[in-house]
Amino acid sequence: MLYNIPCRIYILSTLSLCISGIVSTATATSSETKISNEETLVVTTNRSASNLWESPATIQVIDQQTLQNSTNASIADNLQDIPGVEITDNSLAGRKQIRIRGWICPYISRHLLSLNPLQARCRRYSRGER
């Protein structure tokens, strides 16, 4: 079934469609800019991401240049130089265990070492577990 649409309504609807496309493109561009500006991810023991400058704790940053210049075989080897970080090899298929100030993350080799730190589960050792 064909409808007879007046030319004025067609032009206005086409114009509004074009304007909405421009606005959505501008919104997408600004969100991409936000993502590219936030390159530093802070990994804490409570598994949440936060801004580096808003954190109340002492933070060590290993930047991309340091990782590129490093001769270490893994990220775990780079983390060994940070105070409060202890790396142990539990010899289960080459997995490493990382303790950050007494907190142990049993799945850290799968998540942090594969650059997915938000899924790592951490727990605090009690005196009887050491």
Curated annotation (Swiss-Prot):
Pfam families in the cross-refs: Plug
Signal sequence coordinates: 1-28
Residue intervals of the TBDR plug domain: 51-130
InterPro entries: Plug_dom (IPR012910), Plug_dom_sf (IPR037066), TonB-dep_rcpt-like (IPR039426)
Domain of life: Bacteria
Additional detail: Encoded by the CP4-44 prophage.
Family: Belongs to the TonB-dependent receptor family.
Protein name as catalogued: Protein YoeA
Organism: Escherichia coli (strain K12)
Species lineage: Bacteria, Pseudomonadati, Pseudomonadota, Gammaproteobacteria, Enterobacterales
